[in-house]
Amino acid sequence: MDLQRATALTRELFDAAIAAVDVRAAVARSIQFDGDTLFIPPAAFACRRSEIGRIVVIAVGKAAAAMAAEAETILGDALSAGFCLTKYGHGEATRAIPVREAAHPTPDAAGLAAAAELRALVTGLTEDDLVICLISGGGSALLTAPAAPIGLDELRATTGLLLAAGANINELNVVRKHLETLKGGGLARAAAPARVVALAISDVLGDPLDVIASGPCSGNTSSFADAWAVIARYGLEQQLPTTVIAQLQAGLRGTIPPLPRPDDPLFAHVSAAVIANLPRS
């Protein structure tokens, strides 16, 4: 079996395992609301509804629609707004949260438009507001927000080259988060100063929150040097689009700031937890 087929088979097994997780039950265990107090035990969050401004639910990933549907059922009229982004064919009916679909694993224009819609939703929230971010496998490819001047075509080409070379999900996400603006803590930054609680269903062995869906609400533990090392490992230095090379090289030189680390003050208003994963499924 060649490496590309082995990688594809591994992803199929991961997808099957994630599908076997009782997504709604995982969310129901993790978000509890009695009409007065909101409890989110995995993230050690508890607050009276009267102490929260807007409650916004965001769900991104292949399990996003089921997660969003359960969250809106739990919250009822306490839900102020929401947004769901999932893979084509994975959507389902929700009461109040709009559902968008986009391509996976190679990003497309629908993912780009959805990312802009999501950013607009969380921009302007206050410190009294709460964002509940529900993350699942596939979120990295779906949430497409390339850093200028990188365009969608360049991002698609880079993803295609890495996949064809046999890069694993960890390697792919290290590169992605250094080329985009909502990964590597970028979503938490966009939502600031609102409080953020991120709940993830993991498709990554070891459950690293900064790797699952490229860590949109998590501090980053990788660097531009790590991203470039992935490119070099697969001999892609001369094949990548010039805008991608320029972005990574600028990061190596320090002319682009590094992604925020876990101890960055940005994450003082963020809590996160894995609520289901492959071993427990």
Model feature map: region roles:
Residues 1-281:
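N-terminal loops that bind phosphate or other acidic moieties
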